[in-house]
Amino acid sequence: MKAVKGRLERGVGFTVLDRLSVRSFTKDELKSVYWILSSLIARPVAQSFSGTLLYDVLDTGKLKGPKVRADLTSAELDFHTDYSYNEPPRYFGLQTLRTAKKGGRSGVVSLLTAHNEMRRHHPRLLERLYRPFWLNRYGEHAPGLPKASSHPVYSFDGNELWARFNPRNIYAGYELVGKTLDEEGRKAVETMHSVLSAP
C-alpha cells in the first residue's frame, strides 16, 4: 500500500486494486478488507455529518432534491468531488461489491489536468474558479448552521493545489441562498464540466 500511496501523491493520482475476488468473501468481510487497505493509506474520515465512514452508493428509490444526496438515487452523476460542500477527504476510495444490471459506470478524472487545460484555453474563466461559489450542504451540518457553504473550486496554499468541484452542488447552492450565479461563474462551471467530460 506504500506504493499505492506514492502513486496517489506523486503519480497519476489514482490506482486500481483488482486482485481480490469479491466472490470469495462476504460483504462484511470485503468491507473489513477495504477498511484495512484504506487505513494503510490514511486515517479514514467520515463521508457524512452523521459520521458514516463507509458509505453505500445505491438506488434507494428517492428522487434527487435539495436534501437528497444524488448517490442515493438512480440519477446519473457527473464527475465531482465527494463531500465538496464541507471538507473533502484527501483520498477517496470506491469498492465495487456488485455491479449494476444496467448503468452504474464509474470514471476518474484529474482536477489538476483540468486546471492546466483551463489555464491553457480559458485563463479568464480559471480565475473565476479561484473565487468562491455557493454549495448546497444537503443537510450535512449541525442544526442552526448555514445550509450552504462558500468555497472556490481551486485554491493554492503555496505548496499544493487544492480542488473541489461539483456542479450540482453549486447550482443547488445558489438556489438555496436565493442568489443568481454570475454569468462568468456559470460559464466557468460549464466550461470546467466540458473539460472533465471530454474524451
What are these regions (language model features)?
Residues 49:
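Contiguous, non-catalytic segments that form substrate-binding/exosite surfaces or channel walls
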Residues 1-3, 10, 15, 22-24, ...:
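Active-site environment of non-heme Fe oxygenases that use a 2-His-1-carboxylate facial triad
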